[in-house]
Amino acid sequence: MLNYVAPEELLAPLVPAGVDLDHWRGTLYVSVVGFLFRDTRVLGVPIPAHRTFPEVNLRFYVRRDVAGETRRGVVFVCELVPRRAIALVARLLYNEPYRALPMRHALVAQQHGAFAREYAWRPSREWTRLSARTFGPSRVLEANSEEEFITEHYWGYNKQPDGSALEYRVEHPRWRVYEVSEAHFDCDVVGLYGTQFHDSVNCKPSSAFLAEGSQVTVFTGERVTR
């Protein structure tokens, strides 16, 4: 997870109806996140040849207050997956901004328990990549830390064609995290995300870490209006 400071004027036009931007200590973030999905099921049914695959997404953070409850969530700007069928299902179920490109991933063990993780995709002739190298053992999330803010968002929101928003719940345990000794995002930011993200994402990240991950359940969405 590579995290970048972003200005409000960049993110405000992308916020779905009924939610507000979520800050950590007064700062707004966008994150470039790589995942490896395993044993994926849609409505409880495994899809042959589509159960294990990587994803790389760009997201930012929002919140919604409902009857005294604060629901912290994410909004995806772009999500890359390696198969068209995966992108099609996600767009149909959640209207998520998925795009299918050739992708690959690698996990390389290093000395003293460290490892390197890489996700790569090919938008044209050249491969571009997101990578990170860990050091030290994993640790629990610290309360009120930036890592906790980035990982502890259990709702997803996205705009719908009629102007409303879709809200869906995501369930997983708290993730342990690894510190990162180096991280790289070698990508044509303008070509992938648009010129508006150049200044915020085409630079050294504010922070980077790697999470262990776990089983994740994504629930059916419901419409939200302001």
Predicted regions, residues:
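Glycine/small-residue-rich interface belts in oligomeric ring/scaffold proteins
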Residues: 6-58
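Short amphipathic
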Residues: 1-3
